[in-house]
Regions:
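Short, surface-exposed binding/anchoring microloops in extracellular/periplasmic proteins
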Residues: 44-72
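Short, surface-exposed alpha-helix to beta-strand junction/turn motifs within ectodomains of secreted
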Residues: 71-84
Length: 139
């Protein structure tokens, strides 16, 4: 009885490993990070969760400076713009609060109803720069 049970468990383990190995990890290709260096502040943005079927789009944002504190509220100064000019405002910032010289977090937007061909993440006034624009082609 013990031999039969161990064979069943080993078989189940092997079957599960084969299924996991063949499952796709992601439905959308990874998009490259974009960066902006202006007014003594470096901002790097990496799309993390975009694509069809996703309800919330996520962008990892890293800001570094050695001059003035990073006091901007990213929910107020950021917007996502598609190729048709439609603007989407952030619904959440999960990360470091305003202040300091190094901030990191995830900026979240509700996903557009349809998949746009391209998007731009625009940030106004971060580190004293007018507008920083980060662009990605999606289709």
């Amino acid at each position: 009885m013990l031999k039969l049970l161990s064979r069943v468990l080993i078989g189940a383990f092997v079957f599960g490993a084969v299924l996991l190995d063949s499952a796709p990890l992601s439905t959308a290709p990874a998009l490259a990070a974009r960066s902006s260096d202006a007014a003594g502040v470096r901002v790097v943005v990496t799309p993390k969760n975009l694509g069809p079927g996703v309800t919330v789009w996520e962008f990892e944002v890293v800001m570094d400076t050695h001059s003035n504190p990073l006091n901007e509220n990213l929910i107020q100064v950021a917007a996502l713009v598609d190729e048709a000019g439609r603007r989407y405002t952030p619904v959440a910032w999960q990360g470091d609060p305003p202040g300091g010289h190094h901030r990191k977090g995830v900026l979240q937007f509700l996903a557009p109803a349809g998949m746009p061909k391209s998007i731009e993440l625009r940030m106004n006034g971060v580190g004293g720069a007018d507008t920083r624009t980060f662009r990605w082609e999606l289709k």
